Swiss-Prot record:
Disulfide bonds: none
LRR-type repeats, residues: 180-201, 203-224, 226-247, 249-270
Cofactor(s) needed: Mg(2+)
Organism: Aspergillus terreus (strain NIH 2624 / FGSC A1156)
PANTHER family cross-referenced by the UniProt entry: CARBON CATABOLITE REPRESSOR PROTEIN 4, POLY(A)-SPECIFIC RIBONUCLEASE
Protein name listed in UniProt: CCR4-Not complex 3'-5'-exoribonuclease subunit Ccr4
């Protein structure tokens, strides 16, 4: 078992690496269901790496290995191979190759059964390790070594397995169900192949496969993006899969004792592990794209019903797409010039009536998307985030914001508005004396863009909201209040839109705005503008990156229409009436993908996979008829995260088709004149 109490205190007796304790005398595996690693739900932060919990992995003591020279080359190894050191390479004695030889020597000393488990057990004699005992004793407070064990919620109690020196020729697939494992020792066996299911162990930080008969590694090895140590000493490996380029956290790759090809060997000898991994990543070929996402038809109604398609996508702006955030992505796939073309291609292929993009900077909107999408009959509305105000023009180009596009031949733009959550909050009458509004909310410059559209042909009107909320999980209260302010402002706008005058001359709008006016001869006469009795009767789409998972406070407020003032996400902070009397809104909103139980994810990276993006709609005015489905599951077995060559952002696009329900507005009765009784 692992224990955190004495980490770093137990150097292995043979001079090997310092370990956290684990024991092999375990009556049964403990359930992984209690293992809840902390994750950060957004790409701006979830790539921060944790610091090492132990000292340098290979601290040599004054024991036998301390006297071993870098040229330690035993005449015979377990698999019959001999040390493969090119003495004629001048660089062979640099620091990188010296480390290889040192680690290889250590590995060859560890060929006995359960070497690492036994060494740790020997080192920890007299120190109480969390004992195997009935569950009822787990929360005891008395420890034999005199320390006091604090009560805590159940957790995974061990994280390492040592199957070293067992003569294993194959591995049971059940081994790879222990996805909580952080260390796995399979060294000095007789394995000739590694199962593809190794890719399931995505928490592995240390994997030792030394002293086997491996000739290759599966592509799925690239899924182990938490790996820091990968030991392959003394196998028969000649080449490495390009997918190892995904292992951006790998510090040490042990390959001495393998007939590795000259190009790869030269990279690691001269420049070390990081350089080799970078080489594999940058030289990675573009694999076949996944199958197209299924178009899931939910309601195959008559084509005569008014239909509207809506697409929402967080595009991942250039300033956020850094190699420090996305170290697993090849630089050419991370470049904005490449990714923007992928985004544009997807938008054109779906040809949605309405498109909502988040994280689009001003330069990309004005210099690329607006120009390119104009060829596809799109008109756009854009606002940058609040920080752009007061900046020099050139600097402001890099500030991202929200861009909403709509088909100019189908819709008339009646109004457009921008909601700055922080500025709106401080203008509220009840904001006075509420420090949290100023200290936590006002400093965040996130926005929503609102457009009010009318269908030229049918007269139906639509409110389209495009929002991007704050990401940090430590600011749940901020996300909740941003959502509450968003709903308040939409309520006010919708009430005004219900009183909006009708369009009196749609033909003029059509000829002046629509491309290819000559086609208008075949268009039916447009219907009059539809009237609505109240704001909540106008069809509403609310799209965006809400940075909130299903079941969160922000999600529940949108879905349920109300939230208590005592919600724990508020953390007893003061936000005026919003924290005193609670939050409400009048709309009957549903998530479009709620019809299929939501997608598996909308944001996909090695450390985070969750649902953050939504297309909300008012269920009293609209009905979901079709959706763009999941990303192919088989494709994801070899892809640890987005963006990549096929997906331009860490978020995926949401795309849905809606049917407009029957009119809910004012009913105008026809006058047939005097009637006979």
């Amino acid at each position: 078992m692992y224990s955190q109490t004495h980490q770093g205190q137990h150097v292995l007796m043979n001079g090997g690496q310092a370990h956290q304790r684990f024991g092999m005398q375990i009556p049964k595996f403990q359930s992984q269901g209690h293992h809840h690693p902390a994750q950060q739900p957004h790409h701006h932060a979830h790539h921060n790496q944790a610091t090492h919990n132990i000292t340098h992995q290979h601290n040599f003591s004054s024991g036998a290995l301390a006297a071993a020279t870098p040229h330690f080359t035993p005449s015979h190894m377990q698999n019959g191979a001999h040390a493969n050191v090119d003495e004629d390479i001048d660089e062979s004695m640099n620091e990188h190759w010296q480390q290889q030889l040192q680690l290889a020597a250590e590995s060859r000393q560890a060929s006995s059964p359960h070497y690492y488990a036994r060494a740790v057990a020997q080192q920890t004699k007299g120190i109480q390790i969390a004992p195997s005992q009935p569950d009822g004793q787990e929360n005891g407070t008395d420890n034999r070594n005199g320390t006091v064990k604090t009560k805590s919620k159940p957790r995974q109690g061990w994280h390492a397995l040592d199957f070293g020196g067992q003569g294993l020729r194959a591995l049971s697939t059940s081994l790879f169900n222990y996805v909580f494992l952080e260390k796995l020792y399979l060294n000095h066996n007789k394995l000739k192949a590694l199962p593809q299911t190794i890719g399931q162990l995505r928490k592995l930080e240390h994997l030792d496969l030394s002293g086997n008969d491996l000739t290759e590694l599966p592509e799925e090895i690239g899924m182990l993006t938490s790996l820091k140590k990968l030991y392959l000493f003394d196998n028969n490996i000649r080449t490495l899969p390009y997918e190892m380029g995904y292992l951006y956290r790998l510090d040490t790759l042990g390959i001495e004792g393998n007939p590795l090809n000259d190009i790869l060997k030269s990279q690691i000898m001269k420049e070390g592990t990081k350089a080799l991994i970078r080489y594999l990543r940058e030289e990675m070929p573009v694999h076949l794209p996944p199958p197209d996402r299924d178009w899931v038809i939910l309601d195959d109604t008559s084509s005569s019903t008014e239909k509207v398609t809506v697409l929402s996508h967080n595009a991942l702006c250039d300033s956020s797409a850094t190699s420090s955030h996305f170290g697993y992505t090849p630089s050419r796939a991370l470049s904005w010039e490449f990714r923007r073309e992928l985004i544009l291609s997807e938008l054109r292929s779906h040809d949605s009536d309405i498109v909502c993009l988040q994280e689009v900077d001003q330069g990309s909107y004005n210099g690329f998307f607006r120009e390119q999408l104009a060829y596809n009959d799109y008109k756009g509305v854009y606002w940058p985030r609040g920080r752009a105000m007061g900046m020099q023009e050139e600097e402001a180009k890099n500030v991202d914001g929200c861009a909403t596009f709509f088909k100019g031949s189908k819709f008339i733009l009646l109004d457009k508005q921008m909601i700055n959550f922080g500025q709106t909050a401080v203008r509220r009458p009840d904001a006075k004396g509420q420090d949290d509004i100023y200290n936590r909310l006002w400093q965040k410059d996130h926005i929503a863009v609102v457009v009010f559209l009318e269908n030229r042909l049918t007269g139906s009107r639509f409110i389209v909201v495009n929002a991007h909320l704050y990401w940090d999980p430590a600011f749940k209260d901020v996300k909740l209040i941003q959502t509450a302010i968003l709903m308040e402002e939409i309520t006010k706008l919708s009430d005004g839109y219900a009183k909006w005058p009708p369009c009196t001359d749609k033909t003029a709008f059509r000829f002046s705005e629509a491309e290819g006016g000559g086609e208008s001869e075949n268009q039916p006469e447009p219907a009059p503008s539809m009237e609505y009795a109240s704001g909540d009767q106008i069809p509403l789409f609310m799209c965006g990156d809400f940075n909130s998972s299903p079941g969160s406070a922000a999600y529940n407020l949108i879905a349920n229409g109300r939230l208590t003032e005592e919600h724990p996400d508020l953390e007893k902070r003061l936000y005026g009436n919003l924290s005193r009397v609670g939050m409400t809104h009048p709309f009957k909103l549903k998530s479009a993908y709620g019809s299929i139980g939501e997608l598996s994810f909308t944001n996909y990276t090695p450390d985070f996979k969750d649902i953050l993006d939504y297309i909300w709609y008012t269920s009293n005015t609209l009905h979901v008829s079709a959706l763009l489905g999941e990303v192919d599951k088989d494709y994801l077995q070899k892809v640890p995260g987005f963006p990549n060559f096929h997906f331009p952002s860490d978020h995926i696009a949401l795309f849905a088709e809606f049917s407009v329900k029957g009119k809910k507005g004012k009913v105008v009765e026809a006058d047939f004149g005097p009637q006979r009784s």
